[in-house]
Amino acid sequence: ARICPRILMKCKKDSDCLAECICEEHGFCG
């Protein structure tokens, strides 16, 4: 499993997100 803090963060690309979160299609990290 990826390490991804459960924090709602808007993003445009994966590098906008914390830890191993990825930028999902709805525009938020997950």
Curated annotation (Swiss-Prot):
SMART domains: PTI. The keyword Cytoplasm does not apply. It comes from Cyclanthera pedata (Achocha). CDD domains: PlantTI (cd00150). The presence of a 'disulfide through disulfide knot' structurally defines this protein as a knottin. The record marks R6, I7 as: Reactive bond. Keywords: Disulfide bond, Knottin, Protease inhibitor, Secreted, Serine protease inhibitor. GO terms for molecular function: serine-type endopeptidase inhibitor activity. Strongly inhibits trypsin, weakly inhibits chymotrypsin. This is Trypsin inhibitor 6. Belongs to the protease inhibitor I7 (squash-type serine protease inhibitor) family. Pfam families: Squash. GO terms for cellular component: extracellular region. Disulfide bonds join C4-C21, C11-C23, C17-C29. It is found in: Secreted. SUPFAM superfamilies: Plant inhibitors of proteinases and amylases. Signal peptide: none annotated. Its main location: secreted.
